[in-house]
Amino acid sequence: MSLMDNLLGILRVRVQRGVNLAVRDVSSSDPYVVLKLGRQKLKTKVVKQNVNPQWQEDLSFTVTDPNLPLTLIVYDHDFFSKDDKMGDAEIDLKPYIEALRMELSGLPDGTIISTIGPSRGNCLAEESYIRWINDRIVQHICLRLRNVERGEVEIELQWIDLPGSKGL
């Protein structure tokens, strides 16, 4: 059995920016983001001395199990010691996957397909909207980091169908 037999598609995660991240060095931090989906792990570049970093980086994961959560961890890069953890968040992909399974062609650009509100059960800092934009389903997410005194990270999800994949 090949990867293509189980492959549903590609999840592209745009790591946009961090907001008011924790200070882990003398007066600032050198943050980067690690994203994990199943056994896959990808990271952004380090932004030096900035608690409001702009990453604007696309990280792409192959998706074989739509039930796996996406985990985000922010670290402070250190040269001479272990990198300090600056908080984490977990993203439930199920609402996004459900939207992908709907028949949505012909909708006006910008249409809100679904709204997910912040709750104790998720890491959302504010309402997250799943929208139809340029014939694609896009979800903008602002995450409140856990296990840290402060900080938020903004990401955007986008799905890429692959020819020959199982699809959703």
UniProtKB/Swiss-Prot annotation:
Keywords, alphabetical: Abscisic acid signaling pathway, Calcium, Cell membrane, GTPase activation, Lipid-binding, Membrane, Metal-binding, Nucleus
Principal subcellular localisation of the protein: membrane
Entry protein name: Protein C2-DOMAIN ABA-RELATED 3
Keyword field contains Calcium: yes
Family the entry assigns: Belongs to the plant CAR protein family.
Domain C2, residue spans: 1-106
UniProt-listed InterPro entries: C2_dom, C2_domain_sf, CAR1-11
Keyword Nucleus part of the UniProt annotation: yes
SUPFAM superfamilies: C2 domain (Calcium/lipid-binding domain, CaLB) (SSF49562)
Function summary: Stimulates the GTPase/ATPase activities of Obg-like ATPases. Mediates the transient calcium-dependent interaction of PYR/PYL/RCAR abscisic acid (ABA) receptors with the plasma membrane and thus regulates ABA sensitivity.
Positions with a binding annotation for Ca(2+) 2: D25, D30, D76, H77, D78
PANTHER family referenced in this protein's UniProt entry, alphabetically: PROTEIN C2-DOMAIN ABA-RELATED 3, PROTEIN C2-DOMAIN ABA-RELATED 4
A Pfam family hit: C2
GO MF assignments: GTPase activator activity; metal ion binding; phospholipid binding
Highest taxon listed in the record's lineage: Eukaryota
GO cellular component: nucleus; plasma membrane
Localization in the cell: Cell membrane; Nucleus
Biological process terms in GO annotation: abscisic acid-activated signaling pathway; positive regulation of abscisic acid-activated signaling pathway; positive regulation of GTPase activity
